[in-house]
Amino acid sequence: EDDLTHYYVATYVTDWGEESQPSDPVQMETVLPTWSARLRVNYYDVSLSAYGITKMRIYRSVTSTEQAEFLYIGEVEINPDTSFTHFGDSSYNLGGTTLSTENYDRPAKGLKGLTQMANGVVAGYFGRTVCFSEPYIPYAFPIEYQINTEDNVVGLASMGTNLVVCTQGTPYLFQGTTSSTMTNARIPVQQ
């Protein structure tokens, strides 16, 4: 039998089902496919309950000749003694759900001016940077959805799926159906 080396990540889950960005990958010991592995989850923090975080989802690496990804293997309640048993067999207990929150970055420190757009996107800013959330996921602000302006931003106004960005210099109009398709153009008027 071939030895297997697996990597694991965990995400926090709130009582509303909101799922966080994953932890850094942790390498599990190399095991034979028929062995079981007991994972000790040491992310417990008393303050988690203040944010409604009640569970952790565990994902395991699965590789093929074309790609590597993390697949869901289970969910555990958060408490000081959380542990999780998983078997080494690559086909055992894989729910098939691929980790989808890898780019769910926290809102940037100092983010302000939060504005809801009609497409479910929340926009905000800090300094010269305009930030956009994942649609309908207002706690996930992927870094790749940040767009810089030439001058410091002073305010935002939503108009449907458009966003007017007021700066200390020239205003901008941001347009896009989703956060990943946002483009901007200067409005040729001094503020």
Annotate each PLM feature.
Residues W16, S64, S90-Y92, R128, ...:
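Short loop/turn segments at secondary-structure transitions that flank enzyme active sites
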Residues V121, T149-Q191:
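Beta-sheet-dominated scaffold domains
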Residues E1-F126, P138-E144:
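Disordered, low-complexity "stalk" and linker segments at domain junctions of extracellular
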Residues S36, R128, R186-V189:
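Generic N-terminal initiation segments characterized by hydrophobic and/or small/turn-forming residues
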Residues R128-Q146, Y172-N184:
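Surface-exposed loop/turn elements that mediate protein-protein interactions on large endomembrane-trafficking
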